[in-house]
């Protein structure tokens, strides 16, 4: 996920977490450009360990002032419910709503252009196929005779899915979040997305929502939408877990609410979108530039990193392509600003290149080198990996089948992207026979005695006494 007009991604593990100040990057600029797409350049062999470590730091997001804005919204929605959501929708979206929530079952089928419908149908099928394959069979293990243990799977009963509006419509995010919820069997699925100026919802988002089993649509965005799903209102069901992207205010609301009395969890912390591209001399400069820009265009806070692996790479051709393509993009101004705080790294070989990538832990990792598949085993930290010259990051964003809600800000070191598991919970079950308790009980009683927990010990020994009495009789 990312703080962009689109998918959101990880940034802070708890509402109490504020990112530490970023270490300054080494001032070893090897090349500059007067183009709209200038990127700083560094050679790893010339940097100290501290300087290399500084390159992994992301631009800092200061949530202190944002919390001051979001907290009153969270509390207002808690107290006034639908009325507060309507007021904030007028204030921020300039829309006066009659109804905040609509039931998807009450909506008519959505008519789309045939080519658009086919594209989303293909995406749905691929996303469904990949996520349904993640189902695991239940297994029962008999650890010792008469002692059986297993883990059973249950869905999270109610979930909230946030699909941003902003400067771009994102029906792809509706699929990425709703399809695994559908497979998991979540009974209540609330999709929140900002309404357009006439109070309607993007028809492509509605099509995807209906196809993927969404039950309710909340016509609201921002912190007020997150708050409505977390607290519940007269018209909006309360959810148990909230997923999805958003701007800094959406992220702040998720951070605040996950440790509040609302008792709601969130998918992951979130920060700006990012990509790291590893390219060797065989990579097509046109493709490399396009991949860098596909992330940079998300917004000025996005970050792109180019890692040049080995000798023979025509960096000048890549820079020229970046400048050429950037100037032709409708969102070129966003891309240019993002490139202004992005950078290029020179690695002596692929081992050093992937080692740097593992330290950086990117949301998206593109390995555009000859025989890319052979390097997969070295990858330790990345949200999603794209191997080879024919695998642009865009396919993962839309329709290859993998999920595009991914950890950013370096959280790929310890977080995974959204998957079927994100919508499931696992419950352990144990069942002992009389023989099983006779075998295991004395050991449990002894451990309880060591820990000084007499009631624990007696829960076992009293049963063992009953067993012995039965045997004696």
Swiss-Prot record:
Which GO cellular component terms are attached?
chloroplast; cytoplasm
SUPFAM superfamilies (UniProt xref): ALDH-like
Q: Does the keyword Secreted apply?
A: no
Q: How is the cofactor bound?
A: Binds 1 zinc ion per subunit.
Specify the domain of life of the species encoding this protein.
Answer: Eukaryota
Q: Where does substrate bind?
A: 273, 295, 298, 364, 397, 451, 456
Catalytic residues at 363 (proton acceptor), 364 (proton acceptor)
Q: What is the annotated localization of this protein?
A: Plastid, Chloroplast
The name of this protein is: Histidinol dehydrogenase, chloroplastic
Give the organism, scientific name.
Oryza sativa subsp. japonica
């Amino acid at each position: 996920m990312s703080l962009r007009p689109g998918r959101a991604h990880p940034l802070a593990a708890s509402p109490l977490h504020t990112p530490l100040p970023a270490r300054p990057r080494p001032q070893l600029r090897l090349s500059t450009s007067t183009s709209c797409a200038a990127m700083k350049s560094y050679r790893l062999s010339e940097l100290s360990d501290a300087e290399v470590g500084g390159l992994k730091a992301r631009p800092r997001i200061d949530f202190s002032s944002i919390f001051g804005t979001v907290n009153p919204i969270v509390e207002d929605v808690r107290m006034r419910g639908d009325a507060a959501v309507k007021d904030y929708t007028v204030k921020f979206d300039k829309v006066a709503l009659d109804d905040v929530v609509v039931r998807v079952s009450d909506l008519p089928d959505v008519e789309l252009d045939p080519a658009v419908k086919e594209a989303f149908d293909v995406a749905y099928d691929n996303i469904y196929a990949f996520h349904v394959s993640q189902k695991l069979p239940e297994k029962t293990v008999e650890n010792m005779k008469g002692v059986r243990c297993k883990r059973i799977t249950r869905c999270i009963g109610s979930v909230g899915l946030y699909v941003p509006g902003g400067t771009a419509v994102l029906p792809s995010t509706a699929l990425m979040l709703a399809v695994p919820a559908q497979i998991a069997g979540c009974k209540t699925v609330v999709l929140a997305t900002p309404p357009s100026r006439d109070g309607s919802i993007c028809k492509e988002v509605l099509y995807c929502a209906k196809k993927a089993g969404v039950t309710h649509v909340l016509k609201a965005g921002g912190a007020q939408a997150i708050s409505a799903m977390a607290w519940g209102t007269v018209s909006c069901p309360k959810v148990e877990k909230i997923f999805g992207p958003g701007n800094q205010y959406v992220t702040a609301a998720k951070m605040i609410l996950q440790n509040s009395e609302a008792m709601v969890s969130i998918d992951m912390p979130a920060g700006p979108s990012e990509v790291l591209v590893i390219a060797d001399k065989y990579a097509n400069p046109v493709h490399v530039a396009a991949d860098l820009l596909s992330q940079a265009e998300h917004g000025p806070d996005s970050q792109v990193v180019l890692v040049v692996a080995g000798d023979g790479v025509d960096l000048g051709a890549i820079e020229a392509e970046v400048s050429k393509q950037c100037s032709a993009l409708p969102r070129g101004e966003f891309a240019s600003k993002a490139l202004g705080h992005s950078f290029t790294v020179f690695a002596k070989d692929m081992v050093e290149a992937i080692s740097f990538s593992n330290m950086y832990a990117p949301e998206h990792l593109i390995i555009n080198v000859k025989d890319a598949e052979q390097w997969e085993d070295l990858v330790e930290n990345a949200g999603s990996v794209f191997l080879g010259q024919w695998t642009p990051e865009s396919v993962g964003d839309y329709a290859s089948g993998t999920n595009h809600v991914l950890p950013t800000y370096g959280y790929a070191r310890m977080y995974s992207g959204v998957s079927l598991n994100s919508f499931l919970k696992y419950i352990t079950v144990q069942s002992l026979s009389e023989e099983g308790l006779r075998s295991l009980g004395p050991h449990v009683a002894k451990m309880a005695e060591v820990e000084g927990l007499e009631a624990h010990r007696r829960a076992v020994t009293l049963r063992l006494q009953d067993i012995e009495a039965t045997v004696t009789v």
